[in-house]
Structure formats: structure tokens, C-alpha cells
Amino acid sequence: MATYKKRGFKPKDKDEEKRLEEQESTTAEVFSSLDQGASRTEEWVSTNQNYILGFIGVIAVGLLGYLAYDQFVQKPKDIGAANELYYPQQYFDLALNATTEKDSLFNLALNGAEGKYGFLDIIEEYPGTKAANLANYAAGMAYLSMQKYQEAITHLGNFSSDDEMLGAMAKGGLGDAFMQLGQPSDALGYYENAFEFSNNQYTTPRFLYKAGVTALELKQNAKALQYFQRIKDDFATADEARTIDAFIGMAKSGK
């Protein structure tokens, strides 16, 4: 720290004078070191400014490259994929509402026809797009309906969404697939994921019910009772609540 003399200050004796001279010398050395450090920094920047500017340039080019990719590659890719989704979606909707030939319609939705892409083509040709993500959901549900459970697990497992309905339905679909494959423990985990995913009047009581029934099968009666009781308490108007008292009785009796 610098030492300053007051105006008119005189040292009391020689020892005091010597001490002041030493302080002034130390202060001068500190400022000299700071000046040398600043000079070395300026010298380094001057010597390496091409490197520094080049490094900044690399960052700028990378950022511009990302923005250009998003604007000129990813966005057009998303638009193209979304346009392709229209054709298989029509067959998927028809299959859901059909009473006969469901599998034929689902196959058209999956594989396409008349030169048009199906869901599987969109997944392969437009990876990373929102349309490909939705195509995974639709393909998984189609395979589930066609009783091709491993394929259903693959595609539903590749789907991700924050949507409270689609996200829950995908988790529940995985539960259904594992249940059909004779893996109730795995199924229960996905049913629990499904009703925990969001809280609404449709998917929550549906998967609480499936989780409860599966828990009964696994002899986890306390857990089953908890799920059935929640339906009774929180979703009294849901379809699943109509016979819930009987299931509550089964869970309590241990049957």
C-alpha cells in the first residue's frame, strides 16, 4: 500500500526517518511490479493478437454456423417432415376408428403407399425432427394395436414429450406392451410413470387403475389399495371409479 506524508511532516528521529525511507522504497517496488505486469500483458496481447482475434473468429463462425444450420437446414427439414406426416396420419386415424381391417390400415400408416412416406420412413429420413418424434409415438401405438409388442416398446421408448396427454399415453402404452409380454413388474413401473407424468381427469385415473390391478397381480396389495383409494377420492366421476369399491375390497382382503 502507498505511504503518504502529511504536509509539514518531519520525522522525529533517525530511526523514524529510516523506516519511512524503507516504506517509500517498498511502495515504489510495488508500483514498479504493477507497471511491469501491465506492460507484459500488453506485450502478450500485442504479440498474440492474431491468435486472439482468430479464436474470437472461430467462436463467431461457430455461432453463425449454428444459426445458419437452424435457419437453413433444421427448420426446412422440420417443415418437410411435417408435410410428410399428413399422409400416414390419415390411415392411422382411419385404423383407430375402423371395426375391420385395422391391421391393413395400420400397415399403410407405418409403411406408406402410392409413393408417400409412412411413419417408419419419416423416422428414418427425418431424424431429430418433431415429426419423426411424433411418428415414433404413432408407430408405437400402431404396433401395440397389432400385438407386435417389442416393436411397440422400441418406438414408444424413442418418443419424448412434455405434453401431459401424449407423454402419459406413451408411458402407459409401454406398460401395456410389457404386460402383454408377461412382465408385470416392468408394466407396473411404466403405469406408475404414466399417472405421475401429469394430473388430469383422463390419463391419471386410467393408469392408476391399471397400476392397481397390476399391483394386485403382484401381491402388492397395500400399493394397489393406495391407487384404488386415490381414484375413489380424487376421480369420483371417472369411468374407473364405477367399480372401484369392489377393487378396494379385493385389495383389503388380500385376494
Model regions: which residues?
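Short solvent-exposed coil/turn linkers within tandem alpha-helical repeat scaffolds
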Residues: Y51, E124-A132, M146, S160-A168, ...
